[in-house]
Amino acid sequence: MGLPAQLPVTLLCLLAGTAHFIQGRRGDIILPEVIKTLNILTERKTPCTKLMIADALAVPKNTTEREAVCRAATALRQFYLHHKVSWCFKEHGELGDLRLLRGLDRNLCSMAKLSNCPGKEARQTTLEDFLDRLKTAMQEKYSKRQS
């Protein structure tokens, strides 16, 4: 008893359609997830949020939204991979926040869909200010998407 010759082709088409649907839905989920994570991180006022991070949100006007998001992800990654930052989060028992920053980085990279972006920003700001401004930008993006 064999399978009809058209069955594998049909299954492949269904699988491809499902993957496209899931990928599209993932994009709809990422932005609210980013905002939720930023809400959690900005509510907590801890010593580690006073640490300095590259001000990747101060971008030239001709920067695309994807580039800006990619720069923010790069700045976050460079920030949380630094040994002094990891030490601060461990010292103050904030490993959950460190995990949230890593997840935020992953989600921002997914939103940007860029593999390489500049990451050396001259200006510095506190993590607290960076996260507040990023949250405002993401909320504005979400509002535009809803209207």
From Swiss-Prot:
<feature type="glycosylation site" description="N-linked (GlcNAc...) asparagine">
    <location>
        <position position="62"/>
    </location>
</feature>
<feature type="disulfide bond">
    <location>
        <begin position="48"/>
        <end position="88"/>
    </location>
</feature>
<comment type="similarity">
    <text>Belongs to the IL-4/IL-13 family.</text>
</comment>
<dbReference type="InterPro" id="IPR002354">
    <property type="entry name" value="IL-4"/>
</dbReference>
<dbReference type="GO" id="GO:0005615">
    <property type="term" value="C:extracellular space"/>
</dbReference>
<keyword id="KW-0202">Cytokine</keyword>
<protein>
    <recommendedName>
        <fullName>Interleukin-4</fullName>
    </recommendedName>
</protein>
<dbReference type="GO" id="GO:0050776">
    <property type="term" value="P:regulation of immune response"/>
</dbReference>
<keyword id="KW-0732">Signal</keyword>
<comment type="function">
    <text>Participates in at least several B-cell activation processes as well as of other cell types. It is a costimulator of DNA-synthesis. It induces the expression of class II MHC molecules on resting B-cells. It enhances both secretion and cell surface expression of IgE and IgG1. It also regulates the expression of the low affinity Fc receptor for IgE (CD23) on both lymphocytes and monocytes. Positively regulates IL31RA expression in macrophages. Stimulates autophagy in dendritic cells by interfering with mTORC1 signaling and through the induction of RUFY4.</text>
</comment>
<keyword id="KW-0075">B-cell activation</keyword>
<dbReference type="GO" id="GO:0035771">
    <property type="term" value="P:interleukin-4-mediated signaling pathway"/>
</dbReference>
<keyword id="KW-0325">Glycoprotein</keyword>
<dbReference type="GO" id="GO:0016239">
    <property type="term" value="P:positive regulation of macroautophagy"/>
</dbReference>
<dbReference type="InterPro" id="IPR001325">
    <property type="entry name" value="IL-4/IL-13"/>
</dbReference>
<dbReference type="GO" id="GO:0006955">
    <property type="term" value="P:immune response"/>
</dbReference>
<dbReference type="Pfam" id="PF00727">
    <property type="entry name" value="IL4"/>
</dbReference>
<dbReference type="GO" id="GO:0050728">
    <property type="term" value="P:negative regulation of inflammatory response"/>
</dbReference>
<dbReference type="GO" id="GO:0008083">
    <property type="term" value="F:growth factor activity"/>
</dbReference>
<dbReference type="GO" id="GO:0045893">
    <property type="term" value="P:positive regulation of DNA-templated transcription"/>
</dbReference>
<dbReference type="InterPro" id="IPR018096">
    <property type="entry name" value="IL-4/IL-13_CS"/>
</dbReference>
<dbReference type="InterPro" id="IPR009079">
    <property type="entry name" value="4_helix_cytokine-like_core"/>
</dbReference>
<feature type="signal peptide">
    <location>
        <begin position="1"/>
        <end position="24"/>
    </location>
</feature>
<keyword id="KW-0339">Growth factor</keyword>
<dbReference type="GO" id="GO:0005136">
    <property type="term" value="F:interleukin-4 receptor binding"/>
</dbReference>
<dbReference type="GO" id="GO:0005125">
    <property type="term" value="F:cytokine activity"/>
</dbReference>
<keyword id="KW-1015">Disulfide bond</keyword>
<keyword id="KW-0964">Secreted</keyword>
<dbReference type="GO" id="GO:0042113">
    <property type="term" value="P:B cell activation"/>
</dbReference>
